[in-house]
Amino acid sequence: NGELIRAASGERVNYIMSKVAPSGITGNTSFGRLLNEPDLVKLATKAMDLLFKATNTKKHGFFTADFKEDSNGIPYITEINIRMVAFNYSFALGGANFSEDILALMSNDPTFDRTFKMYDFEPGTIFLRDVDVEPILMKESDLTKL
């Protein structure tokens, strides 16, 4: 119905096969963080509102916004996609199950709470991913213990 229902934030730190891309960015995150960044959600929402207003269309579906910070820490949107990020399962492991949310919405599940919810993650939560294996969710402080 054109309303934001769910949101979450994550950070890509390192990338799978980063040496094959001139920029070092492949889009497939090998090491990332689950974040609590309501300001980024507000910026993404503002950008989406502007885009939909400019195209005279109604918001519908799943969207992701990618940001990159400048040297002063100011975030800028680099792209907006109409799909989930590759590390969506890492979000689910952290409690933000967007796939389940979408199924509930599409099936008009009467028990689904359509009130806006920004998923909140335990601070310091990271994920590790590689090709053909399930991601690992852990505390960043535990990474040095391995």
What would you call each of these model-derived segments?
Residues E100-L146:
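Peripheral (often C-terminal) accessory segments that flank ATP-dependent C-N-forming ligase machineries
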Residues N28, K59, F63, F67, ...:
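A sequence-level detector of short, solvent-exposed, charge-rich linear segments
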Residues N1-R12, H60-K68, S141-L146:
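Phosphate-binding glycine-rich loops and adjacent basic patches that engage nucleotide phosphates
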Residues K19-I25, F52-K58, N108-D120:
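Intrinsically disordered, low-complexity coil segments
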Residues G61-F62, R83-A92, N97, D120, ...:
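Residue-level preference for alpha-helix termini and adjacent loops
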Residues F52-Y89:
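Conserved metal-phosphate-binding beta-hairpin within the catalytic cores
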Residues N1-F52, N81-M106:
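ATP-dependent carboxylate/phosphate-activation module, predominantly the ATP-grasp catalytic core
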Residues G24, S30, F67, L137-K139:
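Short beta-strand element of the conserved SAM-dependent methyltransferase core
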